[in-house]
Each structure stands twice: as C-alpha cells, then as structure tokens.
Curated annotation (Swiss-Prot):
Subcellular location: Cell inner membrane
Pathway: Protein modification; lipoprotein biosynthesis (N-acyl transfer)
This protein's record includes keyword Transcription: no
Gene3D superfamilies listed in its UniProt record: Carbon-nitrogen hydrolase
GO biological process, one term: lipoprotein biosynthetic process
InterPro entries recorded: Apolipo_AcylTrfase, C-N_Hydrolase, C-N_Hydrolase_sf, LNT_N
EC number, as in UniProt: 2.3.1.269
Residues spanning the membrane: 8-28, 49-69, 76-96, 121-141, 157-177, 186-206, 464-484
All copies of domain CN hydrolase, residue ranges: 220-457
Protein name: Apolipoprotein N-acyltransferase
Role description: Catalyzes the phospholipid dependent N-acylation of the N-terminal cysteine of apolipoprotein, the last step in lipoprotein maturation.
Pfam families the record matches: CN_hydrolase, LNT_N
Amino acid sequence: MNSVLALIAGAILPLAFAPFNWFPIAFVSPAILLAVWLRSRPLVAWWRGWLFGFGFFGAGASWVYVSIHHFGNANVPLAVLITVLFVFVLALFIAFQGLSFSLFFRKRKAALTALFAFPAWWVVWEWLRSILFTGFPWLFLGYSQINSPLKGFGPLFGIYGISLIVAFISGCIYLLVTSKKLNKKIMCLILIILPFIVGWVLTFIPWTRPGSESVRVGLVQGNIGQRLKWDPDTLYSTLHTYYSETQKNWDHGIIVWPEAAIPIYPQQVSVFLQALDKEAKQHNTALMTGIPIYHEKTNKVFNGLMVLGDGHGLYLKRHLVPFGESFTSSKICNLLMKYFDIPMSDLSPGPEDQEPTVVKGIPFAPFICYEIAYPTEVLNHLSNKQFIVVVNDDSWFAGTIAPAQQLQIAQMRALETERYLLYSTNTGITAIISPEGKIVKSAPQNQRLLLTGQIKPVTGKTPLMRWNYYPVVGIIIIFLLLTFL
C-alpha cells in the first residue's frame, strides 16, 4: 500500500506546476512521501523513492517522447523505450534521496526529521540533480509557488530557498496530521501559515530600481515547423516571415527573433544581414536574432544570438542540451547522432567570458533555451545587466506541457533578479515577464505574430544577486545540525 501511495503522490505532483498551477499539491505530495519514508527501511525507502520519482517525472517530463519520435526519426517502440529510460534515470535521484534519508535520519526524532532534515535533504538533492550528468534542473518544488505568496522569498533566497520553505511546510503538514497533542497541532498550523504571511509582506519590498523611461519591444513568433525551418528550400520563406513582421514595426526600440530564427550561418546570408543591420540603424532599432555561428578557423559551430542595428554583441550559448545539441566523442554517441539526424546536434559550448551584449546603450543578459533553467549560471552571468532576453524554440515539444513549464522557470529567473525578461520563442509561448515574475503579455501558441509591450531597464541588485545561495547553504547546514540535537 505504501508503495502505491508513493507512486500516486509522485504522479500528482506535476499538477502543482504550469500549466495546471495547483500549487497546494506541492505541499501535500512531499508530505505523503515523508510519511512513507519514515516507515521504511533504507532499501525499501530506495524503492518507494524510485516509485515516487517514476510517477513524478513520468507525468511531468515524459514530453521528451515528442522530440525523440517526431523529430528524432525514432519509431514508436524505440521512442517509448528511450523515454522510459530517461524517466527511470531521473527517478534514481529520488530513490537515492530516500535511501540516504532513511540511513541518516529515520531513527532521529520525528519532529526534528520532518521540520529540518526533510527540507534540507530535499534541496540538497534538487541541487545534485541540477549538476550531475550535465544536470536536469526541472520541476523544482519552488517553481510551483510562482503564483503563491511564497514568491516573496524569491529575490532573497531564490528557487532553492523557496523549495526549502515548501518542503518545510510539507514536514509541518506531516506533523499536523500525526501529532496527537493539541498544542503541537496549533504550533504546526502557525508554522504552516507564517511563511505565507512573511512571503506576502516581502512582495511589497522593491529591491531594485526601474528606470524612468520605457522601451517599446516586439517579439516575433514565426511559428515555423522544425522540418520546414531546417529545409534549405524554405530558407527564403523563413527569412521573409521574420522580416515582414519586423518591417511593419520599426517603431519598436527592440525587436527579438527567437532561437535559430535564421537557420543558416552568417557567412551564407551576409548580404541579408548587412541590409537588415543598416535598416535597423536607420530606424534606431536594436534587433537581435538567434543564429548558428560557424568559426572557420576552429571548424566549430555554436548556437548564437546576434545583435544588429542600435546595439552590438554576439552571444554564444554556454550550456548545451546533452544529446540534443552535443554528443560525446564516443562511437556509440556518434552513431546515435547519425541515426536520429537532429539539426544542430554537434555544437560547441561558448566560452565563459564573452563580450557584453548591449541594445540602445542598455546592457542585457542573453540566454538560449535550456540555459535559463540553471539558477546559479544565470546569477553568475547577470552582473550589471539591466534586463534578460531568452530566445527559445519549443516546437521540439509541441503539444506538450514543456513550454509552459519552461516559461514558469523563466518567470522565477525574472523574480529572483527583479529584471524584465523577454521570452521569445518560435511557436510559443512568447511572453514579456515583469520583475515581479508576472506574465505581462503572452502570445497564443502556434500563431504567427509580433507580441508588443514595454519594458524598463532595471538597476540595483536583489539580495540573492548580492549573496548568491550562501545563505540557503547556511540554513541547510543549520537544519542538518539541528536534526542531530
């Protein structure tokens, strides 16, 4: 029965995230897992943790099937097998989280374990999942709270801090249900309610300073299917799509085209780029576009973002998607690359230190696709940037919940840094996000259009930008020490 309960608890947890946003589930589901683990010996806790993880990632991340089958040319059985293996491996993180939790904490006092060990250990394993095997920083508990009062903790403690608070509340819920004394139940209720009150108050504190002048922006959503996009015969049509939407809107100060909007090297469309750059300068418009970059001297290809017109800079994507944008040099990986025939699947990562990207005299932080999901990497490269730009192409996962999940992640990055964030995608969800992490405007998916809005450059730093995650690390250490009192 406990094993079935663990599986169900994991399977319902994705409902707490976008596009469903039933955020209270994020407190209940881990509380159920905690109850199961506290009744399990180490190996049993491993198994039940794996079941929870299989349900969680099976329901929340199985969208990889779409890209493997529809765009990787894998037949249905093979695509299903790869998807199951993907979910199987992800579930191992929670399995070993359960094993170690049971080994270290099961015999400690239940109250201390629930209040301190459980939330601290949960965040430790979220962090491990973000760095091991290139990382999969997806579906962290804290993302589910982007629309709850707990979002107020975002500028202070970031995603890991909010995850810590969510898991802490889960521990309180477990104690509320299992405690027999009224005074303990009342204390648990107070501990559950208090973070929401504090978080709500924190939402009224501005940590940064928006500029006085607004900049009009336009995000072009080309809505070009993957197969058409990479077909050489449709190159002219693709370029015309983006140019025609731009030509009608040169009155915008900033125009953004999505990831690989120009699906060909700059050397091959130099005349087009020169003309586009000249026209943008004539209208005092900064135009940025995703484009693959080929370095002839090194024979390397990069996923890039180029700035034209009233601005300058070229950004090369640093953190590549494993097996989507990069393969190791092993023979097996080379065979996989040839079999799946994925466009731009043998890229090189850009250098850590790159020239600043600037539009209309405003420095901004560019990120491409998957990079926005790495909390510490975003912080490390933000520095004095005054807004954030993310270019993406979620058509790889068309018809799934992945685009909504990634947009929610982008909302958290905007909230953590209190910067406007321009989220430009090929097929949607294109959006403009406020420094409060709210979606100011968004475009419907699978439509060709230009999303317009206004942003303000932001100066100053949030506490998270100043301190990084050191306070959260300190709290985790204290929590773990308290467990052994």
